[in-house]
């Protein structure tokens, strides 16, 4: 039988942790997962971070950032344009955009180059 995307992610995560990895580098780890599986993975990431495992992951899913990120690094065309604590990142762009934008709203403004990085 073939593993679901969620089971594949969990399998590879378990494999890395079996070697006592202190750093996990994951490319779009929740992409293609259903909402329940995505929430389960984010919970696993939070628990691992609480235990001292550093997790670096790329994503286009802003809800993952809202749930898991301590730090957000914005990279465009291979160049780091912004890197800061999540709260500072949101605060900076909230001042620039005004109101109470969600992280997704902020990312849309950045992508449309409506704000200054």
Label each residue range with its predicted role.
Residues 35-37:
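Helix N-cap at the start of a conserved alpha-helix in ABC-type nucleotide-binding domains
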Residues 53-61:
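Conserved H-loop
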Residues 65-67:
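A short, surface-exposed alpha-helical micro-motif characterized by mixed small hydrophobic
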Residues 83-84:
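ABC ATPase "signature
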């Amino acid at each position: 039988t073939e593993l679901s995307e969620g089971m594949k992610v969990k399998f590879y995560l378990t494999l890395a942790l079996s070697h006592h990895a202190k750093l996990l580098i994951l490319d779009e780890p929740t992409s293609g997962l259903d909402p329940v599986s995505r929430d389960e993975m984010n919970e696993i990431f939070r628990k691992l971070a609480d235990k001292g495992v550093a997790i670096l992951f790329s994503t286009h899913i802003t809800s993952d950032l809202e749930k898991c990120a301590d730090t957000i690094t914005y990279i465009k065309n291979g160049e780091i344009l912004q890197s800061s604590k999540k709260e500072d990142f949101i605060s900076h762009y909230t001042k620039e955009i005004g109101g109470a934008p969600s992280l997704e709203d902020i990312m849309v403004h950045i992508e449309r180059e409506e704000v200054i990085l």
